[in-house]
From Swiss-Prot:
The gene is nfuA. Homodimer. HAMAP family: Fe_S_biogen_NfuA. Involved in iron-sulfur cluster biogenesis. Binds a 4Fe-4S cluster, can transfer this cluster to apoproteins, and thereby intervenes in the maturation of Fe/S proteins. Could also act as a scaffold/chaperone for damaged Fe/S proteins. Its cofactor is [4Fe-4S] cluster. [4Fe-4S] cluster binds at residues 150, 153. The keyword Metal-binding applies. InterPro entries: Fe/S_biogenesis_protein_NfuA, FeS_biogenesis, FSCA_dom_sf, HesB-like_dom_sf, NIF_FeS_clus_asmbl_NifU_C. Belongs to the NfuA family. GO terms for biological process: iron-sulfur cluster assembly; protein maturation. This is Fe/S biogenesis protein NfuA. Keywords: 4Fe-4S, Iron, Iron-sulfur, Metal-binding. The lineage of its organism: Bacteria, Pseudomonadati, Pseudomonadota, Gammaproteobacteria, Enterobacterales. It comes from Buchnera aphidicola subsp. Acyrthosiphon pisum (strain 5A).
Length: 192
């Protein structure tokens, strides 16, 4: 799925040796499927690994990628390029800007789930969080649930109103209201 050159793997192993035990690597993408798509690489402490992550094994470390964005990282290459000035990691992701959402979904729920995965979750995943659609009732009320860094976060009211609800209401005329049914518990997993 993600081809990491031998030099880049050695570089990651060296970097990880200076990090807390069980820290791994995360490859992420922001705004996938859009002209503004950007990929990145970051350290992934053990407490930031999510159930929605896919684990990829390399020589001496693991790479974690959110399963909802993995298709955008198909045939990606991470390399360590060295020149006269120094060395730099490069990440080339040929499918990062592909719009896979053009596939026709049969139901409103499927369309909303796809929208959340493509438009909202990549932003939330930068803070270790995600949102899932639980159901849409006959009155157009969408019930959602936050997890990871969003669960118990003191900014969740703002995230719900300014990010999730505003975007869902403007994108889907059938949705009249968004309801958060998460049982929020503030803890170490919470972003704020």
């Amino acid at each position: 799925m993600i081809n990491i050159s031998k030099k880049a793997q050695e570089h990651f192993t060296s970097l990880l040796s200076n990090e807390p035990e069980n820290t791994q690597i995360r490859v992420f993408i922001v705004n996938p499927g859009t002209p503004n798509a950007e990929c990145g690489v970051a350290f992934c402490p053990e407490n930031e690994i999510e159930l929605s992550d896919i684990q990829l094994k390399y020589d001496g470390f693991f790479v974690y990628v959110n399963k909802d964005t993995i298709s955008y990282l198909k045939n990606s290459v991470i390399d360590l390029v060295t020149d006269k000035i120094g060395s730099q990691l490069t990440l080339k992701a040929p499918y990062a800007k592909n719009n896979f959402s053009k596939k026709v979904s049969s139901s409103l729920e499927e369309k909303v789930k796809c929208f959340l995965n493509l438009e909202i979750n990549p932003q939330l995943s930068m803070h270790g969080g995600r949102v899932e659609l639980m159901k849409i009732d006959e009155n157009g009320i969408a019930a959602i649930q936050f997890s990871g860094g969003c669960n118990g976060c003191s900014m969740i009211g703002s995230t719900l109103k300014e990010t999730v609800e505003k975007k869902l209401l403007s994108s889907f005329s059938e949705i009249k209201k968004v309801y958060d049914e998460t049982h929020h518990l503030h803890g170490q997993h919470s972003f704020y």
